[in-house]
Amino acid sequence: MHYSTFSLWDTYRAAHPLYTLLQPTRSVDFIKSMIRQYDYYGYLPIWQLWGQDNYCMIGNHSIPVITDAILKGIPGIDADKAYEAVRNSSTTSHPNSPFEVWEKYGYMPENIQTQSVSITLEQAYDDWCVAQLAKKLGKEEDYEHFMKRSEYYRNLYHPSSGFFRAKNADGKWLEPFDPYQYGANGGNPFTEGNAWQYFWYVPQNIPALIALTGGDKAFTNKLDQFFTTTQQSGELNSNASGFVGQYAHGNEPSHHVAYLYNYGQHRSRCTQRS
């Protein structure tokens, strides 16, 4: 079975991991379809509609989908071919993914690539996924390289504001900074979100995010503030709805945040918020 539509920015976070549990055979067909697109385009799908990639979203989120399935041991996937596709899709530049820039600066500069903070955070996670697949296949040099790239999110952390912020290529922080400023798709450092919503996107290393925040107590306090601060500014994307403070239940970047209470001091608040 071949599939030709992959809304991956929307589905890699929860839908595809669920498919591996409920529909593993179909997940294999998804992945084989993605690899066929790699054979045609030279990189895996970004956001494919009816067989054509329209690049409307960021990230390279076929990678976590493929990595997740292989690490779960789902049979029927050629792991070596999959790794070839994953690695080349993380090194061959394509729309919204200028990897020569990524390697040079260790972040996406906003004056070179818009949506730079969101891309930096999401690509760092994709790189962590590449590293995990490389490790499973015994590719130690690749593992070390992509683990290093998975830490690039640190290069956009601004300690005095306590947020991930945009930099230009000269290393200067983009000013003025408003953590409530909402971005849509392009022309803003954040994709369908703001600095509050993207602060929590370091799924590959939550303990490190807690440390950046100042420890368990500060992390929990910031989570509380996230769910209670109602201020907004800038354009609101039509996908953003169901606000609980800064949490936007109507869009994907916020969906995991309530569960982060489980890493802090007040785990019961996960139940309250979710």
PLM regions with names:
Residues 1-5, 11-17, 21-47, 119, ...:
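A conserved hydrophobic secondary-structure block that centers on an alpha-helix together
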Residues 21-34, 55-88, 154:
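Carboxylate/His-rich catalytic cores and anion/metal-binding grooves
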